[in-house]
Amino acid sequence: MSEAAFQMDNGWLEFNSDPSVPDFKVPAGAIDAHCHVFGPGDVFPYAPTRKYTPCDASKDQLFALRDHLGFERSVIVQATCHGADNRALVDAIAHSDGKARGIATVSRAISDDELLELDSAGVRGVRFSFVKRLVDVLPHDTLTEVAERIQPLGWHLVIYVESQDLPDLSEFFASLPGTMVFDHMARPDVTQAINGKAFDQFMRLLADNENMWTKVSCPDRLTLAGPPRYDDVVPFAKRVVEIFPDRTMWGTDWPHPNMTSHMPDDGKLVDFIPRIAVSDELQRKLLVDNPMRLYWPEEFNNGP
C-alpha cells in the first residue's frame, strides 16, 4: 500500500494473505465470476467521490489467488471506489493472458468510441449499483440509456441491489433490455424462510424473466451463523442453483471490500460450492459453462 497516495479507512479489514487450500477441487476450466482489483492507489488513484478507501489489492495478488484456488479464469468487476475510471480494471485484463474479462462502470457521457475501446480491452458488461451507502444512485433514465447503448456490443448488466429495495425496483429491472446478472442473490435476509415472501419475490423475478441471472456468491456477507460453513446461507443458494441451473454463477468477491464481521478464508469459500451445487453437472454449469457462455461465448460456442 502506498501511504503517500492514500490512507485506507480506519478499521478496514484487509484480505487474508494466506488462504487455505480448498478441500473441494473445482472442475477444469473453472471461472471466478466475481472479483475485484483495488489500485494500487499510487498508480490508479481512487475516485474523489468514493464512499470508502480500501487497501490495495493488485492484479498480481488476484491472479496468484486464482491459481491457488484452482481456477483458470476471472471476471473482474469494477469496484465502486474507482468510480467510472476503469483503468485498473483494463490493466488487469491486459495482463491476464486472456484469462480475464471485465465488468465496467460507465457514465452517461461515455462516447461510442470509448465503449468500443472497453469492448476491445475485454469488458463485457456494465455494473449498476443501487446500494446507497456505496454510491450515489443514478436516475433511472440515465441507467436505461446506458443499458440500451451497450446492447449492440452484446454486453450485459450486472445489478447490485439489496433485498429490501427489490420491491420498489423490480418493475424497473424488468423494463431494462438484454441480459442482467444480480450480484449475491440480491442480498437476501437469511434470517427469513427460504420460501418466505421476500426471497420468493426474487425467485419469481428470475422465473418471470429468462434474461435474468444471479451469482450465488458472498455467503460471508449474508451470514449470521458465521464462518467457515455459512450454514444459514446454504439453503438459499442451493435453491437458486437447483431451480435455475443455467443462469447461476459463483465468485469469491476477493478482496472482500467493506467486510465488518470477519474476513473470509477464500479456501473455505470454495468449500461452500459443493454444498450448494451438489452434483458434478451442477458444479460444471455454475463454474464453467454458464460464465463461459456469458464471457467467452466465442470459445464456448466453438468448443468440442
Predicted regions and their residues:
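Mid-to-C-terminal alpha-helical segments outside catalytic/metal-binding sites
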Residues: 2-29, 59-73, 239, 244-247, ...
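Catalytic pocket-lining loop regions of alpha/beta-barrel enzymes
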Residues: 3-9, 139-250, 299-303
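Hydrophobic faces of well-ordered beta-strands that scaffold small-molecule active sites
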Residues: 31-35, 74-77, 100-104, 126-128, ...
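Conserved, mostly hydrophobic/aromatic
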Residues: 34, 66, 89, 118, ...
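Active-site beta-loop-alpha junctions enriched in small/polar residues
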Residues: 36, 79-80, 105-109, 129-133, ...
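Divalent metal-dependent hydrolysis catalytic cores, especially in the metallo-beta-lactamase
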Residues: 47-83, 99-105, 123-131, 155-157
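Short, acidic/polar
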Residues: 56-65, 108-118, 141-143, 198-199
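Hydrophobic alpha-helical segments and helix pairs
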Residues: 111-160
